[in-house]
Amino acid sequence: MNNTFKYVNEDVSGTEGEESDYDPSEFIRGYHESPRSPRLIDYEMGRGLMGNFKGLGINKVRQSNEYDNDTDYSSRKSSKIINDVIHGHMEVPDYIMDFIDTEQFQRLRDLKQVGTTSFVFPCASHSRFEHSIGVSHLAGKYIDRIKVTQPELEITEREQKFVRIAGLCHDLGHGPFSHAFESWVDQLGGSKRFHHEDMSIKMLNWIIDDHGLDEYDSDDIKFISSLIQGKHRPKERAFIYDIVANNRNSVDVDKFDYLSRDSYYLGRSTVCDFQRLMEFSKVIDDQICFLSKEIYNLYELFHTRYSLHKLVYTHKVGKSIEFMIADAFTEADQFLKISDQLEDPKEFINLSDSLLRRIETSKEPELEKSRKIIKNIRNRNLYKFVDEIIVSTDKIRWSADSLAEDIAKVGNGILESDIIVQNLKLNYAFKDKDPVQSTRFYTRYDSTQSFTIKKEETSHLIPNQFQEERIRIFCRSKEKCEQVQTAFRKLLKNHNLSPNPSFTVSPARNIKKI
């Protein structure tokens, strides 16, 4: 096999239940009888968020114009109510439905949120479709709350609307198996580059052009695109750009939703309470700041992210399958021209997780090698995890792209193409920095001034380092696992390094299915 996927540099930096415990009196704030809102929304009582109204003797609520006093809703189509396992009953405005009811957005149903992790955790089969709707819901809820609690900011309906749209469309550009696809494109080399955020903006433009959404002009699209990327923020009103994609400290509603949603479907509990973060925050000097006592909640947010990456998203079996899918795509690329469909959204729309099944059921002889790899995935004949080492930057004595070559030289009968080197970085979404140190806080006693809090003033149990680097070795040939492991450990010994004992697998186990 002409292998181009020899090593992987993976950096998981941010740059990718059923009922909520709401206080009813808090929830109905913003809903009241209004002669300007003729739409009457009936909610099923007895479960979810609206069940809390029963004790108040309220069976029907009318949507408030509190957030949009200058809007005539009588001419608008009805919004929809979606019952979500994470956020309960979500009201989806008609302008959001205009985007949802398109083939470009519906494609997200065929993109699993956790990529190849679903091969390891079978209940985690949720898609980017519901995640994107959830992010839109939280984005709207967040900016609506800021508008109500801080009217002096004069947040416009346009800003509220576009923040929701940005939350909805931020993942439109993901490819098959999400981040695994981006890694595969990077390994192709040459001029091939792919960033899902850029494709998301292309898909957004296509939706607007293709479906006659003429109310959005070029300035509107530019604004929404900046919200998706979290870039090109002006000095004034910079806080609006922190809601969906926060490049300032990585605290955003995208993270709120996927950490909660993934944990739910993975059967894992999460300690972070993102509802409190939204409730106890305010804008000071054009930056979203948090109540000082929420600093522990913020650390829980980033620790939850780190734990999911370490234990779930980078699970060795999931990564093994990811490498096999990458090899299958590489073998199929010359025939299917997958890498030629990365620029035009009208071609890219055909790339989803179903590409695997498309290859698997094909009859073309040109796809035989790819079909064989996919068959091995189905039969659980996977690439084998050989070894892992945790390293410090100052102790690395080789580059990742030369390690496979070094192992092949030391070993007997080992080819470079037998080896996959994964260079993995795990962190708090801010590379090697503490994201909380880039976050500002306020106190109840003076909510007009913001400040930072040193971690030494918070707790001595907060880590001193915020990024760890690991080197993992996988082998494509189960017959050569023992030789690869022996050669790798010889290299480690030469560099005064030792493998990670918690992940070390004996050669005898290596030849079994994982």
From Swiss-Prot:
Its cofactor is Zn(2+). It catalyses: a 2'-deoxyribonucleoside 5'-triphosphate + H2O = a 2'-deoxyribonucleoside + triphosphate + H(+). Zn(2+) binds at residues 131, 170-171, 254. One of its GO terms (molecular function) is metal ion binding. Residues 1-24 are annotated as: Disordered. The keyword Nucleus does not apply. Allosterically activated and regulated via the combined actions of GTP and dNTPs (dATP, dGTP, dTTP and dCTP): Allosteric site 1 binds GTP, while allosteric site 2 binds dNTP. Allosteric activation promotes the formation of highly active homotetramers. Residues 128-259 form the HD domain. Substrate binds at residues 113, 128, 174, 252-258, 262, 305, 309-314. SUPFAM superfamilies: HD-domain/PDEase-like. Binds 1 zinc ion per subunit. A 2'-deoxyribonucleoside 5'-triphosphate binds at residues 83, 276, 291-293, 297, 315-316. InterPro entries: dGTPase-like, HD/PDEase_dom, HD_assoc_2, HD_domain. Keywords: Allosteric enzyme, Antiviral defense, GTP-binding, Hydrolase, Metal-binding, Nucleotide-binding, Zinc. It is an enzyme of class 3 (hydrolase). Its EC number is 3.1.5.-. GTP binds at residues 80, 101-109, 380, 384. The keyword Disulfide bond does not apply. One of its GO terms (biological process) is defense response to virus. CDD domains: HDc (cd00077). One of its GO terms (cellular component) is nucleus. Homodimer; in absence of GTP and dNTP. Homotetramer; in GTP- and dNTP-bound form. Has deoxynucleoside triphosphate (dNTPase) activity. Belongs to the SAMHD1 family. This is Deoxynucleoside triphosphate triphosphohydrolase SAMHD1 homolog. The lineage of its organism: Eukaryota, Amoebozoa, Evosea, Eumycetozoa, Dictyostelia.
